[in-house]
Regions:
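Karyopherin-beta/Importin-beta family HEAT-repeat alpha-solenoid scaffold
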Residues: 1-240
Length: 240
């Protein structure tokens, strides 16, 4: 994988992926022949370093892989969120986030709301399962949640109750013991996105959000937790 990256990449940025490749190298053929079979293997514990390299390949060449390939890849990345190895489920979460943030040549989302819709519920459930069981807050997992909710927009309505309960639990933990500023940032951004998407579409949900979020928000304001206070007011502003 590293050799392929070295000879293929001509122009790349961390934020936007590979923009220019060696014309003599067919990225899609390499992906289908070598990367995809590794990610399709049922044993998540086998060859973790190779699997991590395969996920990195997919993430690096997200601009070159066609949407049809990404549709095939999404459930495989979701499966790897269940891997015990931190490096694997972290790479999988980061790869999901980067595909959801990728743009096509015209600047439109490459894998947008319609493409995400069939995978939204299982992906969000798998990501929150990691948030619940992780000993350390994983900022890449939380960023993937934020991105998925942002791309989904109104499609998040059917899973609002489940997502709100998970966010409430995570919020209670970080308010009691804030440790990872980037994780906290993406958590509060997820709250703001969810409030905008759900309450902006149906004001009948405002009460449920208030019941879930006001207790931890009140704790933040009463204890004057400076790093969280701006996020609390941002969430209030987006309530609708």
């Amino acid at each position: 994988m590293h050799l392929v990256l070295a000879v293929t990449v001509r122009a790349q940025s961390a934020a936007h992926g590979v923009r220019e490749t060696n014309a003599a190298v067919n990225v899609v053929e390499i992906f289908n022949a070598h990367v995809l079979p590794e990610l399709q293997a049922p044993d998540l514990a086998a060859r973790p370093i190779v699997k991590a390299g395969a996920i990195k390949f997919a993430s690096t060449f997200r601009n070159q892989l066609p949407v049809e390939t990404v549709r095939q890849l999404m459930p495989l990345l979701g499966n790897h969120l269940a891997a015990e190895q931190v490096v694997l489920h972290t790479y999988a979460a980061a790869c999901i986030e980067r595909f959801l943030g990728a743009k096509d040549a015209a600047g439109a989302p490459k894998f947008g709301r319609a493409e995400l819709r069939p995978f939204l519920q299982p992906l969000v459930a798998a990501l929150f399962a990691l948030v619940e069981k992780a000993e350390q807050e994983n900022e890449y997992v939380m960023k993937a949640i934020m991105r998925a909710l942002s791309v989904a927009e109104g499609d998040v309505m059917p899973v609002t109750g489940e997502v709100l309960a998970k966010i409430k639990a995570a919020l209670a933990r970080v308010c009691a013991n804030p440790r990872n500023p980037r994780f906290n940032h993406f958590l509060f951004e997820s709250i703001a996105v969810l409030v905008r998407a759900v309450c902006g579409q149906d004001g009948g949900h405002v009460g449920a959000f208030e019941d879930a979020l006001f207790p931890p928000f009140q704790t933040v304001l009463q204890m004057d937790v400076a790093e969280f206070t701006p996020y609390v007011f941002q969430a209030f502003a987006r309530r609708g």
